[in-house]
Amino acid sequence: MRNFKIEKPDESLRGAIREKIDNLNKPKGSLGLLETLAEQICMIQQTLTPTLQHPCHLLFGGDHGIEREGVSVSPRDVTWQQMINFTHGGGGVNMFCRQHGFTLYIIDMGVDYDLTAYPDILNRKIARGTKNFLYEPAMSEAEFDKAVETGCELVDRCHQDGCNVICMGEMGVANTSPSSIWMHLFGNIPLDECIGAGAGLDTPGLQHKRVILRQAVDNFHKLRAQSGNTEEALPYFAGFEMAGAIGAMLRAAELKMTVMVDGFIMSACMLAASQLYPEVLCYAVFGHCGDESGHKRMLDLMHATPILHLGMRLGEGTGALCAYPIVESAVRMVNEMNNFVNAHITKYF
């Protein structure tokens, strides 16, 4: 994988940012998380007057070999069917992108279906789904690197068009499984506590998923001498859509863009990215805490404060997109509210 040069924002501006926010005509801290978000965006952009320009959403699609083990209630056909649905504008992600002015890119990273007849889907297919990580690595290191590079390429495309705030989403049946395993490996949390029902497994289905993922992790430890090493665990368990998202997150941070992070799967990708480059978290805005088991604990691993708590678990980036207007409000607050001096209001604290 390429080396990224991700720098923490220069701290020398933080005092001036806080002073500006504290002197807006309101009680100090009274706008709560909006003030925290405004400070973060100012720090990312290194300015007292931040802007959000040409927001883009990258929707990565890919299938997973582990799906063959019955770890998801949805069949893998749902991946390609939804990808086509997105081209017709009928998905949740489409509606939220339209509502909030995001340019949507639909990317086939590794869907187990020929989607070349759909020109609105960017064909970056690396393979027709990953291998089954119960028995072998999901992909080779070369395939993982190619997926990461694809994510970088797409971020570069958005950035060249003037985008400075970007969101990622995914479509991939069974991708809660690698996400749970990464949470276990990178967070040192018991595996069973990281595994949830995904798209709606019943109790026997959830128990079966736990058995399969336990065996997959055991096999990983047997096959890999340096078990637990981040750079081994990434290609071993990743989906192509997840590797693409990791590349996109790292490249966006390198370009000092604001990265809107969605639910369980995209949070797992950010967790993985932060294992390689901890500085990436400076650029991450966590849209929501979802209803998937373990998501809150995963967010806690990154010391993340999510914006919304709506019980969502759709994926696609929908939770992050829903949170975007709150980020807009934070930016408008720091740019448009008057301060005590200009408003001729007595400062009372």
Q: What residue ranges belong to the model's regions?
A:
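N-terminal loops that bind phosphate or other acidic moieties
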Residues: 1-349
